[in-house]
């Protein structure tokens, strides 16, 4: 079953209950054709073990807790990228919340790696109050974590190739609304906005330049 498969549409989904200790999985995007995969926010209970078959590329971000991927422990803000053909066994001892993006990529992707959240390299963003940690750079797409201190305002900008945001902490804002932790926002190709934060600040996962443009 397809869900939010039309990339020309702006989508906002609240999955705040999962980040607040809920269980289960919130599907953010899926398509009828199996090769397109799906995007979800999943809460894994303590002591669970599961497998990734490796038939598609898997991107994984640890939102809460810890997960072991093929025996390697990854804590909060850690990012793993498993190329197609790379199966994995995953387990969590105390439970975790994960962002999972499983798909066949639009561009060649053969690299598999993991970045630990505690050792990410943060750099100054384009305006004061922003810190950016790059997670993956593709031919057209870019994936990063962005930390916003309270009362930060960013420049108005246009999303060439679209933008996808998952709010990890705090409250993210723009002229269209306010988005607490656990909110997923997908903005289409050539959409625009002027984001900012209030007194809470925010940390977000952001992916740009990767959506369908037709």
Pin down the residues of each PLM region:
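Short acidic-glycine-tyrosine-enriched beta hairpin
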Residues: 69-88, 173-193
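Short histidine-centered beta-strand/loop micro-motifs
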Residues: 41, 49-54, 71-72, 91, ...
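Glycine- and acidic-residue-biased ligand/ion/polar-headgroup-sensing regions
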Residues: 54-69, 152, 159-175, 181
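Ligand-binding loop in jelly-roll beta-barrel domains
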Residues: 73, 84-108, 189-214
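The feature marks the first
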Residues: 23-72
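A short, N-terminal "cap"/entry segment at the start of jelly-roll beta-barrel domains
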Residues: 1-36, 95-140
